[in-house]
Amino acid sequence: MTHTPVLLKEMLSLLSPQDGGIYVDATFGAGGYSKAILESADCKVYAIDRDETVTKFYDDLSVRYPDRIKLFIEKFSNIKNLLDSNNIEGIDGIVFDIGVSSMQLDNGDRGFSFLHDGPLDMSMDNSSYINASTFVNALREEEIANTIYNYGGERHSRKIARAIVNARKKKTIKTTFELADIVRSVVFRGKSKIDPATRTFQAIRIWVNDELGELEKGIKAASEILSENGKLIVVTFHSLEDRIVKTFFKDLCATDCKTFSLLNKKVIEASIEEVSANPRSRSAKLRAIQRLS
């Protein structure tokens, strides 16, 4: 499978890696950002990912760039404690590419996608006791409806929640295809190109992994460990994520002490050419700040 990093040129242009610099790729994934940073300068990259299956991508990079990259299997919300405990300092830049990766979506066994049949999991660290099965088989109808509405923007959330509860009364809901069919039984596509199950799956994934809470904690911790002139760059794919980043960056840069400055006043989005080549980039938004002192 080919992994295409989103907004790669724009990220590199803002980060501007320098020889001798120290950078953190807080969402390593398939290593697209890390690889590009290592190619751009004679620098060092510390990579973080909560999904241990990414080690196969790390192994390739560590052979190509010995002693210049190190991977930690950890949630990025723990970035400050992780780097402090390993005596890593002098951070010149931190990049985040938020959301589920293509390799997770394409692996049916992970249960992220309604396009591939598999167990209802959706856990990014592959070891959580809370997963998508917990959500559909254990939560109250009202909790299911509210989550699907709040995290997925699904206006049919109450119908979907009722259908899920009715279905689980007959038998445990076990697979992604079962769940998708339940959603499609009460929400019809009509002329829309978007599958009726899309928003529900997105909402459940966000809930399972506490993605919004992780993002809030992660970018706050990252902002605290940047060196002077260090840059924090975040790419999001969901309006709720972008709102969190936009608000946090605005608040940081609005303080009287002027510790931070916005690197891009206007949000950066993928070009028409990139969207055509990589449809995943369609909803991507990049925001960046720099520590001044």
UniProtKB/Swiss-Prot annotation:
It is an enzyme of class 2 (transferase). One of its GO terms (molecular function) is rRNA (cytosine-N4-)-methyltransferase activity. One of its GO terms (biological process) is rRNA base methylation. It comes from the Bacteria. Its main location: cytoplasm. Its EC number is 2.1.1.199. InterPro entries: RsmH, SAM-dep_MeTrfase_MraW_recog, SAM-dependent_MTases_sf. Specifically methylates the N4 position of cytidine in position 1402 (C1402) of 16S rRNA. GO terms for cellular component: cytoplasm. S-adenosyl-L-methionine binds at G31, G32, Y33, D49, F76, D97, Q104. It comes from Wolbachia sp. subsp. Drosophila simulans (strain wRi). This is Ribosomal RNA small subunit methyltransferase H. Signal peptide: none annotated. Belongs to the methyltransferase superfamily. RsmH family. The keyword S-adenosyl-L-methionine applies. NCBIfam families: 16S rRNA (cytosine(1402)-N(4))-methyltransferase RsmH (TIGR00006). It catalyses: cytidine(1402) in 16S rRNA + S-adenosyl-L-methionine = N(4)-methylcytidine(1402) in 16S rRNA + S-adenosyl-L-homocysteine + H(+). It is found in: Cytoplasm. Keywords: Cytoplasm, Methyltransferase, rRNA processing, S-adenosyl-L-methionine, Transferase. Transmembrane segments: none annotated. HAMAP family: 16SrRNA_methyltr_H.
